[in-house]
């Protein structure tokens, strides 16, 4: 089992990534939604936004992502990736993450994302927050969101450090209309949204 020290974590500054899910050469709508959300996060961090797209004969659909705000796309095209397999996709994504080192990675809360996200997080020894309904980096904006939409005590909200660059996430709590803030250890931050 590997562990990361602060120097290792500092190396993970390769932008915000979105796992772009496709099936039989058709991009899933969740991918476009996450590209849009990822664009906001990348802008807040002052970094680039990249999609990561796996499959076979997918070069054509990779071009679609630029129109939705991606600065680039990592395309992993191989016959063995034509259909989703847990082990294959996990290996390719984790190997690519370790090579290019994104700061944040978003994965859709689809059937594939719910299978893939936890496996990648475990293999990369990082945190994962599922079913996110709000993502933010900008601390003042996030505090305002929490004040307006959560039942947290103001002292808890005010206790969030202003210099915190980590991804802030909000997810449903207790199966009802309430929500709870969440955070994961630094790098790479995975959030099925």
Describe each region flagged by the PLM.
Residues 1-193:
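N-terminal glycine-rich FAD/FM-binding segment characteristic of electron-transfer flavoproteins
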